Amino acid sequence: MIKKLSIQPASGLQGDLSVPGDKSVSHRGLILGAISQGTTTLHHFLPAADCLSTLTALQKLGVPIKRVDTTVTISGRGLRGLTQPQQPLDMGNAGTATRLLTGLLAGQPFETTLVGDTSLSQRPMERVRQPLQAMGAQVQLTAGHLPMTITGRTLHGSRTEMQVASAQVKSALILAALQADQASTIIEKLPTRDHTERLLQQFGGQIETAPDQRTITVQPQPALVGQSLTIPGDFSSAAFFVTAATIIPNSHVRLTNVGLNPTRTGFLNILRRMGGQVTVDHEHRMGEPVGTLDVRFAQLHPVQVTATEIPAVIDELPLVALLAATANGISTISGAAELRVKETDRIATIVTELQKLGVRITSQPDGFVIDGRKSWRQPTEPLASHGDHRIGMMMAIAALRLAAPAELESAEAVNISYPTFFEDLARLSQGV
Protein backbone atom coordinates (compact mmCIF):
# COMPACT_ATOMS: atom_id res chain seq x y z
CA MET A 1 0.00 0.00 0.00
CA ILE A 2 1.35 3.43 -0.94
CA LYS A 3 2.28 5.73 1.90
CA LYS A 4 4.38 8.43 0.25
CA LEU A 5 4.79 9.42 -3.39
CA SER A 6 7.19 11.71 -5.19
CA ILE A 7 5.29 13.74 -7.76
CA GLN A 8 7.21 15.21 -10.68
CA PRO A 9 6.31 18.51 -12.38
CA ALA A 10 4.24 18.16 -15.55
CA SER A 11 4.81 20.19 -18.70
CA GLY A 12 1.23 19.52 -19.80
CA LEU A 13 -1.53 16.92 -19.62
CA GLN A 14 -2.63 15.27 -22.86
CA GLY A 15 -4.99 12.45 -23.75
CA ASP A 16 -8.38 10.82 -23.27
CA LEU A 17 -9.56 9.20 -20.04
CA SER A 18 -12.64 7.32 -18.85
CA VAL A 19 -12.96 7.87 -15.10
CA PRO A 20 -14.26 5.15 -12.74
CA GLY A 21 -17.93 4.74 -11.87
CA ASP A 22 -19.74 7.28 -9.72
CA LYS A 23 -19.33 6.70 -5.98
CA SER A 24 -22.73 8.12 -5.03
CA VAL A 25 -24.55 6.03 -7.63
CA SER A 26 -22.56 2.89 -6.74
CA HIS A 27 -23.63 3.16 -3.07
CA ARG A 28 -27.26 3.74 -3.97
CA GLY A 29 -27.37 1.06 -6.65
CA LEU A 30 -26.13 -1.51 -4.15
CA ILE A 31 -28.70 -0.55 -1.52
CA LEU A 32 -31.69 -0.35 -3.86
CA GLY A 33 -30.68 -3.60 -5.53
CA ALA A 34 -30.50 -5.27 -2.11
CA ILE A 35 -34.08 -4.31 -1.18
CA SER A 36 -35.58 -5.05 -4.59
CA GLN A 37 -37.15 -8.26 -5.82
CA GLY A 38 -35.16 -10.17 -8.41
CA THR A 39 -31.65 -9.62 -9.73
CA THR A 40 -29.89 -6.29 -10.08
CA THR A 41 -26.70 -5.95 -12.13
CA LEU A 42 -24.45 -2.93 -11.76
CA HIS A 43 -21.98 -2.31 -14.59
CA HIS A 44 -19.05 0.12 -14.19
CA PHE A 45 -19.35 -0.16 -10.40
CA LEU A 46 -16.70 1.71 -8.40
CA PRO A 47 -14.60 -0.88 -6.46
CA ALA A 48 -13.22 1.74 -4.04
CA ALA A 49 -12.95 1.29 -0.28
CA ASP A 50 -16.12 3.24 0.54
CA CYS A 51 -18.32 1.32 -1.91
CA LEU A 52 -16.82 -2.01 -0.85
CA SER A 53 -17.78 -1.15 2.75
CA THR A 54 -21.38 -0.82 1.58
CA LEU A 55 -21.19 -4.09 -0.36
CA THR A 56 -19.79 -5.97 2.64
CA ALA A 57 -22.37 -4.48 5.02
CA LEU A 58 -25.22 -5.60 2.77
CA GLN A 59 -23.75 -9.11 2.55
CA LYS A 60 -23.72 -9.23 6.35
CA LEU A 61 -27.39 -8.22 6.26
CA GLY A 62 -28.08 -11.41 4.31
CA VAL A 63 -27.94 -10.10 0.74
CA PRO A 64 -26.19 -12.39 -1.80
CA ILE A 65 -23.82 -10.18 -3.82
CA LYS A 66 -21.13 -11.23 -6.31
CA ARG A 67 -18.52 -8.89 -7.79
CA VAL A 68 -16.24 -9.51 -10.76
CA ASP A 69 -14.04 -6.44 -11.25
CA THR A 70 -16.52 -3.62 -11.95
CA THR A 71 -19.62 -5.78 -12.47
CA VAL A 72 -21.79 -6.52 -9.43
CA THR A 73 -24.73 -8.93 -9.31
CA ILE A 74 -27.19 -8.57 -6.44
CA SER A 75 -29.88 -11.12 -5.56
CA GLY A 76 -32.47 -8.81 -4.03
CA ARG A 77 -34.08 -9.74 -0.73
CA GLY A 78 -37.02 -7.36 -0.95
CA LEU A 79 -37.78 -4.47 1.35
CA ARG A 80 -38.52 -6.77 4.30
CA GLY A 81 -36.00 -9.50 3.59
CA LEU A 82 -32.83 -8.33 5.35
CA THR A 83 -31.56 -10.35 8.30
CA GLN A 84 -29.89 -9.31 11.53
CA PRO A 85 -26.08 -9.26 11.26
CA GLN A 86 -24.10 -11.41 13.67
CA GLN A 87 -21.85 -8.53 14.70
CA PRO A 88 -21.60 -4.74 14.33
CA LEU A 89 -21.29 -3.50 10.74
CA ASP A 90 -17.91 -1.85 10.18
CA MET A 91 -18.55 0.99 7.73
CA GLY A 92 -14.89 2.00 7.46
CA ASN A 93 -14.78 5.59 6.18
CA ALA A 94 -18.10 5.44 4.32
CA GLY A 95 -20.21 8.34 5.58
CA THR A 96 -22.70 8.07 2.72
CA ALA A 97 -23.39 4.39 3.32
CA THR A 98 -23.62 4.88 7.08
CA ARG A 99 -26.31 7.54 6.84
CA LEU A 100 -28.25 5.76 4.08
CA LEU A 101 -28.23 2.44 5.92
CA THR A 102 -29.43 4.19 9.08
CA GLY A 103 -32.61 5.14 7.25
CA LEU A 104 -33.04 1.67 5.79
CA LEU A 105 -32.37 -0.19 9.04
CA ALA A 106 -34.71 2.06 11.03
CA GLY A 107 -37.66 0.12 9.62
CA GLN A 108 -36.21 -3.41 9.75
CA PRO A 109 -37.38 -5.85 12.47
CA PHE A 110 -34.04 -6.22 14.27
CA GLU A 111 -31.24 -4.33 15.99
CA THR A 112 -28.03 -3.29 14.23
CA THR A 113 -24.92 -1.48 15.42
CA LEU A 114 -22.80 0.56 13.00
CA VAL A 115 -19.16 1.39 13.71
CA GLY A 116 -16.50 3.14 11.63
CA ASP A 117 -12.89 4.25 11.46
CA THR A 118 -11.49 7.19 13.43
CA SER A 119 -12.53 9.74 10.81
CA LEU A 120 -16.08 8.45 10.38
CA SER A 121 -16.48 8.23 14.16
CA GLN A 122 -15.95 11.99 14.35
CA ARG A 123 -18.59 12.91 11.78
CA PRO A 124 -21.98 14.22 12.98
CA MET A 125 -24.86 11.73 13.04
CA GLU A 126 -27.43 13.68 15.05
CA ARG A 127 -28.59 15.27 11.78
CA VAL A 128 -29.89 11.90 10.61
CA ARG A 129 -31.10 10.63 14.01
CA GLN A 130 -33.47 13.51 14.75
CA PRO A 131 -35.67 13.37 11.63
CA LEU A 132 -35.75 9.56 11.74
CA GLN A 133 -36.83 9.68 15.38
CA ALA A 134 -39.74 11.91 14.32
CA MET A 135 -40.85 9.00 12.09
CA GLY A 136 -40.80 6.64 15.09
CA ALA A 137 -37.26 5.31 14.65
CA GLN A 138 -35.08 4.32 17.58
CA VAL A 139 -31.48 5.38 16.96
CA GLN A 140 -28.93 5.52 19.78
CA LEU A 141 -25.70 7.49 19.25
CA THR A 142 -22.50 7.83 21.24
CA ALA A 143 -22.24 11.54 22.05
CA GLY A 144 -23.75 12.36 18.65
CA HIS A 145 -21.43 10.04 16.72
CA LEU A 146 -20.70 6.38 15.97
CA PRO A 147 -20.98 3.74 17.33
CA MET A 148 -24.72 3.88 16.55
CA THR A 149 -27.36 1.29 17.39
CA ILE A 150 -30.57 1.17 15.36
CA THR A 151 -33.53 -0.76 16.72
CA GLY A 152 -36.00 -1.33 13.93
CA ARG A 153 -39.56 -0.18 14.56
CA THR A 154 -42.77 0.57 12.69
CA LEU A 155 -42.23 3.90 10.95
CA HIS A 156 -44.83 6.59 10.36
CA GLY A 157 -45.15 8.91 7.40
CA SER A 158 -43.97 12.38 8.27
CA ARG A 159 -43.38 15.90 6.99
CA THR A 160 -39.74 16.83 7.54
CA GLU A 161 -38.17 20.23 7.01
CA MET A 162 -34.46 19.52 6.77
CA GLN A 163 -32.13 21.66 8.86
CA VAL A 164 -29.03 20.97 6.75
CA ALA A 165 -28.61 20.72 2.98
CA SER A 166 -27.52 17.07 2.87
CA ALA A 167 -28.23 14.50 0.17
CA GLN A 168 -27.15 11.79 2.61
CA VAL A 169 -29.75 12.74 5.21
CA LYS A 170 -32.40 13.20 2.51
CA SER A 171 -31.62 9.73 1.14
CA ALA A 172 -31.82 8.18 4.62
CA LEU A 173 -35.29 9.68 5.02
CA ILE A 174 -36.35 8.40 1.59
CA LEU A 175 -35.25 4.86 2.46
CA ALA A 176 -37.11 5.08 5.77
CA ALA A 177 -40.20 6.49 4.03
CA LEU A 178 -40.40 3.44 1.75
CA GLN A 179 -41.17 1.42 4.89
CA ALA A 180 -43.59 3.88 6.55
CA ASP A 181 -47.33 3.45 7.09
CA GLN A 182 -48.24 6.40 4.87
CA ALA A 183 -46.72 8.95 2.51
CA SER A 184 -43.86 11.18 3.68
CA THR A 185 -42.84 14.67 2.57
CA ILE A 186 -39.26 15.95 2.75
CA ILE A 187 -38.55 19.66 2.32
CA GLU A 188 -34.92 20.49 1.60
CA LYS A 189 -33.19 23.63 2.79
CA LEU A 190 -31.51 23.84 -0.64
CA PRO A 191 -31.69 21.34 -3.53
CA THR A 192 -29.03 18.61 -3.22
CA ARG A 193 -27.86 15.80 -5.49
CA ASP A 194 -30.83 13.69 -6.58
CA HIS A 195 -29.29 10.32 -7.43
CA THR A 196 -31.52 8.51 -4.92
CA GLU A 197 -34.69 9.96 -6.41
CA ARG A 198 -33.66 9.13 -9.99
CA LEU A 199 -32.57 5.60 -9.15
CA LEU A 200 -35.62 4.88 -7.02
CA GLN A 201 -37.86 5.72 -9.97
CA GLN A 202 -35.86 3.31 -12.14
CA PHE A 203 -36.47 0.57 -9.56
CA GLY A 204 -40.22 1.27 -9.64
CA GLY A 205 -40.47 3.48 -6.57
CA GLN A 206 -43.17 6.12 -6.23
CA ILE A 207 -41.36 9.38 -5.53
CA GLU A 208 -42.18 12.85 -6.77
CA THR A 209 -40.19 16.08 -6.70
CA ALA A 210 -42.17 19.34 -6.82
CA PRO A 211 -41.28 22.09 -9.32
CA ASP A 212 -39.42 23.97 -6.57
CA GLN A 213 -36.87 21.09 -6.61
CA ARG A 214 -36.95 21.11 -2.78
CA THR A 215 -40.16 19.27 -1.87
CA ILE A 216 -40.13 15.48 -2.25
CA THR A 217 -43.04 13.12 -1.62
CA VAL A 218 -42.37 9.41 -1.08
CA GLN A 219 -45.06 6.73 -1.09
CA PRO A 220 -44.65 3.53 0.96
CA GLN A 221 -43.47 0.84 -1.40
CA PRO A 222 -44.78 -2.73 -1.47
CA ALA A 223 -42.03 -3.86 -3.83
CA LEU A 224 -39.13 -2.57 -5.91
CA VAL A 225 -37.96 -4.44 -9.02
CA GLY A 226 -34.32 -5.33 -9.77
CA GLN A 227 -32.63 -3.51 -12.66
CA SER A 228 -29.59 -3.66 -14.93
CA LEU A 229 -27.72 -0.36 -14.58
CA THR A 230 -24.60 1.11 -16.14
CA ILE A 231 -23.10 3.60 -13.70
CA PRO A 232 -21.78 6.83 -15.26
CA GLY A 233 -18.25 8.08 -14.66
CA ASP A 234 -17.87 10.00 -11.41
CA PHE A 235 -18.03 13.75 -12.01
CA SER A 236 -16.12 14.45 -8.79
CA SER A 237 -13.28 12.21 -9.98
CA ALA A 238 -13.28 13.83 -13.42
CA ALA A 239 -13.07 17.26 -11.77
CA PHE A 240 -9.50 16.57 -10.63
CA PHE A 241 -8.37 16.20 -14.24
CA VAL A 242 -10.48 19.16 -15.34
CA THR A 243 -8.59 21.21 -12.75
CA ALA A 244 -5.19 19.82 -13.71
CA ALA A 245 -5.70 20.57 -17.40
CA THR A 246 -6.95 24.06 -16.55
CA ILE A 247 -3.97 25.14 -14.41
CA ILE A 248 -1.08 23.40 -16.21
CA PRO A 249 0.06 25.05 -19.48
CA ASN A 250 0.04 23.01 -22.71
CA SER A 251 -2.80 20.79 -21.50
CA HIS A 252 -5.69 19.31 -23.49
CA VAL A 253 -7.68 16.48 -21.91
CA ARG A 254 -10.90 14.70 -22.90
CA LEU A 255 -12.87 12.87 -20.21
CA THR A 256 -15.47 10.44 -21.58
CA ASN A 257 -18.77 9.10 -20.20
CA VAL A 258 -18.77 11.51 -17.26
CA GLY A 259 -22.00 11.81 -15.26
CA LEU A 260 -23.45 15.29 -15.76
CA ASN A 261 -26.33 15.27 -13.29
CA PRO A 262 -27.18 18.99 -12.93
CA THR A 263 -27.24 18.69 -9.13
CA ARG A 264 -23.54 17.75 -9.30
CA THR A 265 -22.06 20.07 -11.92
CA GLY A 266 -21.90 23.40 -10.10
CA PHE A 267 -18.13 23.14 -10.46
CA LEU A 268 -18.40 23.62 -14.24
CA ASN A 269 -20.47 26.77 -13.78
CA ILE A 270 -17.87 28.21 -11.41
CA LEU A 271 -14.97 27.24 -13.67
CA ARG A 272 -16.62 28.93 -16.66
CA ARG A 273 -17.16 32.11 -14.63
CA MET A 274 -13.43 32.05 -13.93
CA GLY A 275 -12.65 31.84 -17.64
CA GLY A 276 -12.06 28.10 -17.82
CA GLN A 277 -11.98 26.45 -21.24
CA VAL A 278 -14.27 23.43 -20.85
CA THR A 279 -16.90 22.19 -23.29
CA VAL A 280 -19.36 19.30 -23.17
CA ASP A 281 -20.14 17.08 -26.15
CA HIS A 282 -21.42 13.59 -27.02
CA GLU A 283 -24.23 14.05 -24.51
CA HIS A 284 -26.50 11.05 -23.95
CA ARG A 285 -28.20 9.21 -21.08
CA MET A 286 -27.17 6.22 -18.96
CA GLY A 287 -30.07 6.59 -16.53
CA GLU A 288 -28.50 10.00 -15.83
CA PRO A 289 -27.11 12.66 -18.21
CA VAL A 290 -23.64 11.70 -19.46
CA GLY A 291 -21.16 13.39 -21.76
CA THR A 292 -17.54 14.09 -22.69
CA LEU A 293 -15.65 16.98 -21.09
CA ASP A 294 -13.06 18.68 -23.31
CA VAL A 295 -10.67 20.83 -21.23
CA ARG A 296 -7.72 23.09 -22.08
CA PHE A 297 -5.35 25.30 -20.12
CA ALA A 298 -6.73 28.74 -19.25
CA GLN A 299 -5.76 31.92 -17.44
CA LEU A 300 -8.31 32.34 -14.66
CA HIS A 301 -10.15 35.24 -13.06
CA PRO A 302 -11.16 35.37 -9.37
CA VAL A 303 -14.61 34.17 -8.33
CA GLN A 304 -17.13 34.55 -5.52
CA VAL A 305 -18.96 31.39 -4.45
CA THR A 306 -21.88 31.72 -2.02
CA ALA A 307 -24.18 29.45 0.00
CA THR A 308 -26.77 28.75 -2.70
CA GLU A 309 -24.11 27.16 -4.92
CA ILE A 310 -22.50 24.99 -2.25
CA PRO A 311 -24.67 21.81 -2.43
CA ALA A 312 -23.90 21.34 -6.15
CA VAL A 313 -20.14 21.79 -5.62
CA ILE A 314 -19.52 20.51 -2.07
CA ASP A 315 -17.08 17.74 -3.07
CA GLU A 316 -15.25 19.97 -5.57
CA LEU A 317 -14.65 22.91 -3.22
CA PRO A 318 -11.01 21.87 -2.61
CA LEU A 319 -10.54 22.17 -6.37
CA VAL A 320 -12.27 25.56 -6.48
CA ALA A 321 -9.71 26.67 -3.88
CA LEU A 322 -6.89 25.31 -6.03
CA LEU A 323 -8.22 27.10 -9.12
CA ALA A 324 -8.54 30.32 -7.13
CA ALA A 325 -4.90 29.95 -6.06
CA THR A 326 -3.93 30.45 -9.73
CA ALA A 327 -6.39 33.26 -10.54
CA ASN A 328 -5.38 36.88 -11.10
CA GLY A 329 -7.20 38.33 -8.08
CA ILE A 330 -8.99 37.65 -4.80
CA SER A 331 -11.62 34.90 -4.60
CA THR A 332 -14.02 34.16 -1.75
CA ILE A 333 -15.88 30.97 -0.89
CA SER A 334 -18.59 31.33 1.78
CA GLY A 335 -21.55 29.36 3.10
CA ALA A 336 -19.44 26.20 3.12
CA ALA A 337 -19.32 25.36 6.84
CA GLU A 338 -20.25 21.78 5.89
CA LEU A 339 -16.61 21.35 4.81
CA ARG A 340 -15.64 21.32 8.47
CA VAL A 341 -17.43 18.00 9.08
CA LYS A 342 -16.17 16.04 6.08
CA GLU A 343 -13.43 13.36 6.30
CA THR A 344 -11.31 16.14 7.75
CA ASP A 345 -12.02 19.76 8.56
CA ARG A 346 -11.48 20.57 4.89
CA ILE A 347 -11.36 24.31 5.42
CA ALA A 348 -8.42 23.82 7.78
CA THR A 349 -6.65 21.21 5.65
CA ILE A 350 -7.04 23.21 2.42
CA VAL A 351 -5.55 26.27 4.10
CA THR A 352 -2.70 24.27 5.67
CA GLU A 353 -1.71 22.55 2.45
CA LEU A 354 -2.00 25.50 0.06
CA GLN A 355 0.00 27.67 2.45
CA LYS A 356 2.86 25.18 2.03
CA LEU A 357 2.98 26.39 -1.59
CA GLY A 358 3.07 30.03 -0.58
CA VAL A 359 -0.57 30.64 -1.51
CA ARG A 360 -2.20 33.60 0.22
CA ILE A 361 -5.25 31.92 1.74
CA THR A 362 -7.05 32.67 4.99
CA SER A 363 -9.80 30.64 6.60
CA GLN A 364 -13.25 31.92 7.54
CA PRO A 365 -15.80 30.09 9.72
CA ASP A 366 -17.65 29.00 6.57
CA GLY A 367 -15.02 29.17 3.84
CA PHE A 368 -11.87 30.99 2.78
CA VAL A 369 -10.40 33.99 0.99
CA ILE A 370 -7.69 33.33 -1.62
CA ASP A 371 -5.41 35.78 -3.42
CA GLY A 372 -4.06 33.96 -6.47
CA ARG A 373 -1.70 36.71 -7.61
CA LYS A 374 1.33 35.53 -5.64
CA SER A 375 3.70 33.06 -7.35
CA TRP A 376 3.85 29.62 -5.80
CA ARG A 377 7.01 28.38 -4.10
CA GLN A 378 8.50 24.94 -3.60
CA PRO A 379 7.29 23.46 -0.29
CA THR A 380 9.85 22.98 2.49
CA GLU A 381 7.96 20.01 3.93
CA PRO A 382 5.98 17.14 2.41
CA LEU A 383 2.47 17.76 1.16
CA ALA A 384 -0.13 15.68 2.99
CA SER A 385 -3.57 14.17 2.44
CA HIS A 386 -4.40 14.16 6.18
CA GLY A 387 -6.06 10.82 5.41
CA ASP A 388 -8.63 12.63 3.25
CA HIS A 389 -8.93 11.32 -0.32
CA ARG A 390 -10.04 14.62 -1.84
CA ILE A 391 -7.28 16.63 -0.14
CA GLY A 392 -4.70 14.06 -1.29
CA MET A 393 -5.83 14.25 -4.91
CA MET A 394 -6.04 18.05 -4.80
CA MET A 395 -2.44 18.31 -3.61
CA ALA A 396 -1.23 15.76 -6.16
CA ILE A 397 -2.68 18.01 -8.88
CA ALA A 398 -1.10 21.07 -7.27
CA ALA A 399 2.30 19.36 -7.18
CA LEU A 400 2.25 18.93 -10.97
CA ARG A 401 2.45 22.71 -11.27
CA LEU A 402 5.62 23.09 -9.16
CA ALA A 403 9.12 23.68 -10.49
CA ALA A 404 10.61 20.60 -8.80
CA PRO A 405 9.40 17.23 -7.44
CA ALA A 406 7.34 17.22 -4.23
CA GLU A 407 6.47 14.46 -1.80
CA LEU A 408 2.88 13.60 -0.91
CA GLU A 409 2.33 11.76 2.38
CA SER A 410 -0.53 9.33 3.08
CA ALA A 411 -1.19 9.05 -0.63
CA GLU A 412 -3.11 5.80 -0.06
CA ALA A 413 -6.11 7.90 1.04
CA VAL A 414 -7.15 8.02 -2.64
CA ASN A 415 -8.32 4.40 -2.29
CA ILE A 416 -11.44 5.71 -0.53
CA SER A 417 -12.91 6.91 -3.83
CA TYR A 418 -10.40 6.49 -6.69
CA PRO A 419 -7.94 3.56 -6.33
CA THR A 420 -6.47 4.07 -9.83
CA PHE A 421 -6.05 7.85 -9.49
CA PHE A 422 -2.26 7.90 -9.66
CA GLU A 423 -2.15 5.47 -12.59
CA ASP A 424 -4.63 7.62 -14.52
CA LEU A 425 -2.74 10.79 -13.60
CA ALA A 426 0.51 9.25 -14.83
CA ARG A 427 -1.11 8.32 -18.15
CA LEU A 428 -2.02 11.94 -18.79
CA SER A 429 0.99 13.68 -17.27
CA GLN A 430 3.91 11.28 -16.94
CA GLY A 431 4.29 13.20 -13.68
CA VAL A 432 4.02 10.54 -10.95
From Swiss-Prot:
Subcellular location per the Swiss-Prot or TrEMBL entry: Cytoplasm
A Pfam match: EPSP_synthase
PROSITE patterns assigned to the protein according to its UniProt record, in alphabetical order: EPSP_SYNTHASE_1 (PS00104), EPSP_SYNTHASE_2 (PS00885)
Catalysed reaction equations from the record: 3-phosphoshikimate + phosphoenolpyruvate = 5-O-(1-carboxyvinyl)-3-phosphoshikimate + phosphate
Catalytic residues identified in the record: D315 (proton acceptor)
Binding site for 3-phosphoshikimate: K23, S24, R28, S166, Q168, D315, K342
Domain of life: Bacteria
Pathway per the UniProt entry: Metabolic intermediate biosynthesis; chorismate biosynthesis; chorismate from D-erythrose 4-phosphate and phosphoenolpyruvate: step 6/7
CDD domains reported for this sequence: EPSP_synthase (cd01556)
Alphabetized InterPro entries for the sequence: Enolpyruvate_Tfrase_dom (IPR001986), Enolpyruvate_Tfrase_sf (IPR036968), EPSP_synthase (IPR006264), EPSP_synthase_CS (IPR023193), RNA3'P_cycl/enolpyr_Trfase_a/b (IPR013792)
UniProt keyword terms in alphabetical order: Amino-acid biosynthesis, Aromatic amino acid biosynthesis, Cytoplasm, Transferase
Cellular component per GO, a single term: cytoplasm
Keyword DNA repair: no
Gene Ontology molecular functions: 3-phosphoshikimate 1-carboxyvinyltransferase activity
GO BP: any one term: amino acid biosynthetic process
Binding of phosphoenolpyruvate, residues: K23, G95, R123, Q168, R346, R390
EC number, UniProt record: 2.5.1.19
Keyword Ubl conjugation: no
Family: Belongs to the EPSP synthase family.
NCBIfam families, A to Z: aroA
Protein purpose: Catalyzes the transfer of the enolpyruvyl moiety of phosphoenolpyruvate (PEP) to the 5-hydroxyl of shikimate-3-phosphate (S3P) to produce enolpyruvyl shikimate-3-phosphate and inorganic phosphate.
Subunit text: Monomer.
Protein name: 3-phosphoshikimate 1-carboxyvinyltransferase
Native source species: Lactiplantibacillus plantarum (strain ATCC BAA-793 / NCIMB 8826 / WCFS1)
